Amino acid sequence: MPIHIAFCVNDAYIPYITVTLMSIAENHKDDEVIIHIFSDYISQKQKLRLDKVVNPYPNLTLSIQMVDDSALRGLKDTWTIYTWYRVLLPLYLSNEIHRVLYLDADTIVASNIRELFFMDMSDKAIACVIDPESFNSETYSRLKYDSSKKYVCAGVMLMNLDYWREKDLSKTIIKWGYDHNDIIRFPDQDTINYLCRDSKIVLPLRYGIMDYFFKTDSFYQEPYAQELRDCIEHPAIIHYAGMNPWKRELATSLMQDEWEKYNKMLPHPVKKEYITKGWNLVKMYIWNILHPSPKTSTLTRGDVLNKLNSCQ
């Protein structure tokens, strides 16, 4: 059976997901993988860019589908409407596809994920890693559910499509989003967490590694200590949440080298961009020369392991 992986992006984000695609291709050479890309428009130029990545790998198949997002207009889109597209996947994918792994564009698949994809999901809608918001009491008071149910990150989400279809979850999520626009902070992620609060699996951290884990003391204690060690020693999926690895000012992740490795393998590597541009970039450069900041230490994998060992 093939592994199905989905992305929901606009045309401008295609270059970034080519890095993710390269990481998938390199770590699944013996697996049939079908890549589903959902968008409202993809240019011929970007389609060719995708083909150049996928075509050298005969076990990879690329499927591109256009989405009618009229049902989503009016929903809160703090970042982009495309994040809502993932709730439509059960409606757009064939009923013969029983599950799909949704990935944000700022991810790397650092090892084979067959075991994850075919895990038991009986009577569960989703499987995700815990989100930093799970430790924020305001999250639960705002969404009105118990903290024991946890709050997960939808940026890496294994979806049980049979469950979604049986419960008509896509339509329920969209309706709840409209009805609760006033309390939503993280649009579809809030909605998914609330409606799947009793039907989600919390995955080991290695399946959605975020830098937040390494910078938070609670993850160096049980029940997370061994999972944090596995993030360093056996990384599976890296999620550069809030640290876009293609933005020079944000490319400071502990796992930045993994993104760089796969980017270099591409026929057309992604060129890093500055958030600050033009004259503002020149002014920032001059300011940094005239007002040098004291050097701050950068967290390394060794630092994480040393801290874990000292906490034992």
Model-derived segments and spans:
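A glycosyltransferase accessory/donor-loop signature
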Residues: 1-3, 9, 166-312
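Short internal beta-strands
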Residues: 34-41, 128-129
